[in-house]
Regions:
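Conserved ABC ATPase "signature" region
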Residues: 6-24
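Conserved ABC ATPase signature
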Residues: 28-32, 36
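Conserved catalytic motifs of ABC-family nucleotide-binding domains
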Residues: 49
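Catalytic Walker B motif of ABC-type/P-loop ATPase nucleotide-binding domains
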Residues: 53-57
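H-loop/switch region of ABC-family ATPase nucleotide-binding domains
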Residues: 89-90
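Conserved switch/coupling elements of ABC/ABC-like ATPase nucleotide-binding domains
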Residues: 107-117
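ABC ATPase nucleotide-binding domains
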Residues: 128-156
Length: 156
């Protein structure tokens, strides 16, 4: 894939810095680890400050700790650049717990909507089982507080 226009050095450095790989700027891609490679690809994708970032299996070839860091980075980039994320993934845990809208494909669109709506869909239940729809779906809170990922409770 070739970028269609030249980028300014400043834009390249900013994207590499944002993804934490500015120190790898002059390295050969073949010398990078899986996580480094994915971060460089992510830097390339954000270098033009897109409105929509399309990511196909963005944590492929990355260890578990690196996966967490990459997903946190993707969220940070989405927030800072104010861009939407279209995430293609087979990682059902991430898809169902960290997304706003899900489209489940199995040769056709089985279901779409919020993760909670998707998990209630009969085709979803047939594909992944009743247990998956209960375990993998984010619990929707209707109280005056939220639970943070650090386990803290914060008032709304």
């Amino acid at each position: 894939m070739v970028l269609t226009e030249n980028l300014k050095e400043n834009d390249i450095n900013e994207a590499l810095s944002m993804t934490g790989v500015i120190h790898l700027k002059d390295k050969n891609l073949g010398d990078l680890s899986g996580g480094e490679f994915q971060r460089v690809l992510l830097a390339r994708a954000i270098s033009k400050k897109p409105d929509l970032l399309v990511l196909d299996e963005p944590v492929q070839g990355v260890d578990f700790t690196g996966e967490i860091a990459l997903y946190e980075l993707i969220k940070k980039i989405s927030d800072e650049l104010n861009c939407g994320i279209l995430l293609i993934s087979h990682d059902l845990h991430t898809v169902m717990s960290a997304t706003d809208h899900v489209v489940c494909l199995n040769g056709h669109v089985c279901c779409s909507g919020s993760p909670i709506e998707g998990a209630k869909n009969n085709e979803y239940k047939v594909l992944f089982g009743e247990q998956a729809s209960q375990i993998l779906t984010r619990y929707k809170h209707s109280h005056d507080h939220i639970h943070t990922s650090e386990g803290e409770i914060k008032k709304n």
